[in-house]
C-alpha cells in the first residue's frame, strides 16, 4: 500500500464528505483558515509534510463500495483540496473483499471507501488492512461505528430492509410482506430477489442480521427456507 496516500485519504475523506453534503463553501474559500499558517483547513494543521509526500506520488487509487454519487463527490473534493488525481472504481463490498484477498502482497488500490462492515472485518482479521488513527474518530457517537484496532471507521449508516414491487403484487393479487418472516410464505415462491452472498456486502449483511435476529441455528434455518422462495 502506498502509505502516504493511503493515510492522507483515510484522514481526509470523511471530512471531505461533510463539506460536500452539508457545507456549500467552495474548497478554495476554506483554505487558509489556520491563522494564515497553512493553505489547508485548520484540521490539517501539522500535516503539511504528509500532504507534500502524497502530492509527490501524484495519484490515488480508490475502491469504492458506497453509492456512485457519494464516491464521486468525495473523490472530487479530495482532488480540489490537494491537487492529487483520484482514480476510483465502484465495486460491491464483497467484490472489493475478493480483490483485496486476491491482491494480497501486491495491492493495486490505496484506499477502500464505503460499504458494509462485515467484509472489512474479514479483511482486518486476515491482516489485509492498514490501521490508522482518523482525525475525527472522536466525533463518532459510539464505538460500534469503528474498528477497535483502527482498521476502519464508519462514514455513514443505513437501515437494512426490503422493497416490494407494488405493481407486480397487484397483478398477482398478493398482499405485500410486512416483515422478514413473511418472505417465507409459499405465495412468494420465486418472487424474492437477493444478491449473491459471495459477492454482495449487503447480502452478507442479511446473513449477519438474520443470525442476530433469530440466533445462529434458527437464523441459518431461516436462510435455508428463504432460499426456497428466491428467484433463480
Stretches with model-predicted labels:
Residues 1-57:
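Short, low-complexity disordered leader/linker segments with a strong preference
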Residues 12, 84-86:
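Hydrophobic aliphatic residue packing
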Residues 22-29, 82, 106-107, 151, ...:
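Short alpha-helix boundary/capping motifs
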Residues 26-27, 31-32, 36-40, 80, ...:
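Low-complexity, compositionally biased segments
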Residues 56-60, 81-82:
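Acidic/histidine-rich, surface-exposed loop or edge segments in extracytoplasmic proteins
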Residues 61-75, 87-103, 107-232:
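Extracytoplasmic ligand-binding site segments that recognize negatively charged/polar headgroups
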Residues 74-82:
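A short alpha-helix/helix-coil micro-patch that ends at or immediately precedes a cysteine
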Amino acid at each position: 500500500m502506498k502509505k502516504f496516500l493511503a493515510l492522507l485519504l483515510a484522514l481526509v475523506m470523511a471530512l471531505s464528505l461533510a463539506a460536500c453534503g452539508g457545507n456549500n463553501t467552495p474548497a478554495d474559500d476554506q483554505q487558509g483558515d489556520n491563522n494564515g499558517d497553512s493553505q489547508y483547513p485548520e484540521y490539517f494543521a501539522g500535516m503539511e509534510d504528509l500532504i507534500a509526500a502524497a502530492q509527490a506520488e501524484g495519484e490515488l487509487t480508490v475502491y469504492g463500495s458506497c453509492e456512485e454519487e457519494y464516491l464521486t463527490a468525495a473523490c472530487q473534493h479530495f482532488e480540489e483540496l490537494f491537487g492529487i488525481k483520484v482514480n476510483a472504481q465502484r465495486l460491491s463490498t464483497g467484490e472489493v473483499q475478493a480483490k483485496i484477498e486476491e491482491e494480497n502482497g501486491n495491492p493495486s488500490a490505496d484506499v477502500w471507501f464505503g460499504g458494509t462492515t462485515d467484509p472489512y472485518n474479514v479483511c482486518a482479521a486476515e491482516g489485509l488492512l492498514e490501521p490508522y488513527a482518523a482525525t475525527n474518530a472522536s466525533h463518532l457517537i459510539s464505538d460500534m461505528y469503528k474498528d477497535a484496532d483502527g482498521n476502519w471507521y464508519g462514514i455513514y449508516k443505513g437501515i437494512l430492509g426490503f422493497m416490494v414491487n407494488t405493481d407486480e403484487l397487484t397483478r398477482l393479487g398478493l398482499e405485500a410482506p410486512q416483515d422478514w418472516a413473511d418472505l417465507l410464505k409459499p405465495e412468494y415462491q420465486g418472487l424474492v430477489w437477493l444478491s449473491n452472498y459471495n459477492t454482495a456486502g449487503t447480502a452478507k449483511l442479511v446473513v449477519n442480521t438474520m443470525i442476530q435476529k433469530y440466533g445462529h441455528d434458527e437464523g441459518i434455518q431461516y436462510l435455508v427456507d428463504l432460499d426456497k422462495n428466491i428467484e433463480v
